[in-house]
Amino acid sequence: MPSIRVALFADFHFSTPSDLEVLSTLKRQMIAENPDLVLFAGDYIGSHDLYDDVSRETVVKSLEALAFPKPAFAVLGNHDNWDSNEAWSDAFEGSSITLIENQVERISLNGQAICIRGLGDIYSGYWKGLEIPAKCEQRAITLTHDPAGLLTPNATVETLSFAGHTHCGQVAFPLIGAPIVPTRAPRDMHCGQFDREGKGVVSGGLGSSIIPLRFGPLTAPGWELIDINSVN
């Protein structure tokens, strides 16, 4: 079965036009890596106070250019929801990026039929329980913002899953790690790969929140490239 290459981006936290300049570098990296699928895990703005110099529409168009011509799916993060869930949903509507909030889309990639389940952000109160439809034949991946939204009542994960939100702590110190990570997800789901019956990846993301600083060996900004050999 052919593999699927997934690009995962999270937590851009755009606040000014200059913040968008990073996208030209990311685009060059994307062209070089040639993913089959692009996932955006939310938090596109820097704060929930509406800013005038970078509109939602500008952000969405910039993300479209980054993903083009690959199929792309997105969920909203807590900062986007605190700004306006409705306005961000409107900004994505009609774009080439499918906003997949609490719904499932079935697509074909490399000859495989795969379901993508998008879950609303649990941290800001937009999460809804959503079962994987039978039509997905156990071939599904899940995308959400806060990794806490991936957990079942038994603290397991149902599908191959992707999230962001944590910034891998953003500020982390030797020995003690990050003093604050704003999620109810367990520590093994704060950063990078995890395995809770279902496997997944939590991206540390690209931007910063509250303070313009990242500190610590695992907190450097970045995006994830994941090669999936099978989806089951």
Report the location of each language-model feature.
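N-terminal signal-anchor transmembrane helix
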Residues: 1-36
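Binuclear metal-dependent hydrolase catalytic cores centered on His/Asp/Glu-rich metal-binding motifs
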Residues: 90, 94-97, 101-103, 109-152, ...
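Short acidic-hydrophobic surface loop/beta-edge motif
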Residues: 1, 103-110, 190-196
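Conserved beta-sheet core of the metallophosphoesterase superfamily
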Residues: 147-228
